[in-house]
């Protein structure tokens, strides 16, 4: 393995176990020319310093997806989502944790209800965090009776939920792929009236990166490839 698509706890674990080559980003012309190296999105990966051991490849943002012909009243906050779920009982759910998207949805509810700032400096012990997020947990418990299968079980993955949405079994889908809706409309999977949306306060987003394995036999080639992936042409082509 030469190049690795990585972010979050996987990057932190690999870096702390000395499995990554670097720092290398300062050797990439396209990184130096087109990337804001001082941006927090580049300097930090899930609050962990990147230190030049990974180069940004793309960004993801949690969005919700609904068919406006079926549900024209799209929720713009957690409180409106509760009313939405109650209006469409049995037709809303989210992927079972620890699914990546399901976890992001729950974290988004936590930030929406409990606020985000307190977690930036909070002591990371179980009891402190548990107490801080209790209002959001109570909110989720209040949703359960109105969810698909009364919240007793949840879809095993975001892929399963996507298929349930496309089949009309549920009326809401959530994804990290902000461009998935347009692609699925073009492919005929979603109706033309399907729309992605976010809460008014926004949703969780993150950056994904490319790293190089420390035991790579072709580190120079990996750097050439990553540099090319940072070019304006390749980045623009990702959104065609």
Language model regions located:
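Extracytoplasmic ligand-binding site segments that recognize negatively charged/polar headgroups
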Residues: 1-159
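Hydrophobic packing residues within well-ordered alpha-helices of enzyme cores
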Residues: 14, 106, 183-184, 238
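Extracytoplasmic/periplasmic substrate-recognition and gating elements
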Residues: 171-175, 179, 185-239
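Periplasmic-binding protein-like
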Residues: 87-98, 228-240
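Anion-binding catalytic surfaces of enzymes that hydrolyze or transfer phosphate/sulfate esters
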Residues: 151, 162-165, 173-174
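Loop/turn elements at helix/coil->beta-strand transitions in domains of secreted/extracellular proteins
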Residues: 2, 88-92, 145-148, 168-171, ...
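Hydrophobic residues within well-ordered alpha-helices
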Residues: 14, 161-167, 212
């Amino acid at each position: 393995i030469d190049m690795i698509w990585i972010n979050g706890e996987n990057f932190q674990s690999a870096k702390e176990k000395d499995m990554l080559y670097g720092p290398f980003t300062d050797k990439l012309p396209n990184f130096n020319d087109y990337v804001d190296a001082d941006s927090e999105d580049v300097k930090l990966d899930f609050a962990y310093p990147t230190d030049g051991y990974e180069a940004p490849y793309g960004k993801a943002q949690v969005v919700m997806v609904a068919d406006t012909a079926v549900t024209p009243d799209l929720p713009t906050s957690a409180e409106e989502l509760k009313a939405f779920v109650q209006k469409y009982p049995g037709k809303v759910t989210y992927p079972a944790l620890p699914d990546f998207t399901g976890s992001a949805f729950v974290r988004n509810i936590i930030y929406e209800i409990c606020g985000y700032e307190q977690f930036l400096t909070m002591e990371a012990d179980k009891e402190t965090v548990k107490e801080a997020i209790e209002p959001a947990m109570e909110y989720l418990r209040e949703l359960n009776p109105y969810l698909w299968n009364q919240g007793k079980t949840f879809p095993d993955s975001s892929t399963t939920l996507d298929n349930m949405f496309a089949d009309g079994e549920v009326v809401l889908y959530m994804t990290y792929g902000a461009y998935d809706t347009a692609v699925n409309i073009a492919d005929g999977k979603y109706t033309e009236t399907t729309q992605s949306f976010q809460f008014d306060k926004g949703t969780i987003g993150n950056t994904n990166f490319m790293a190089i394995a420390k035991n790579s036999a072709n580190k120079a080639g990996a750097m050439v490839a990553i540099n090319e992936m940072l070019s304006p042409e390749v980045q623009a082509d990702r959104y065609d």
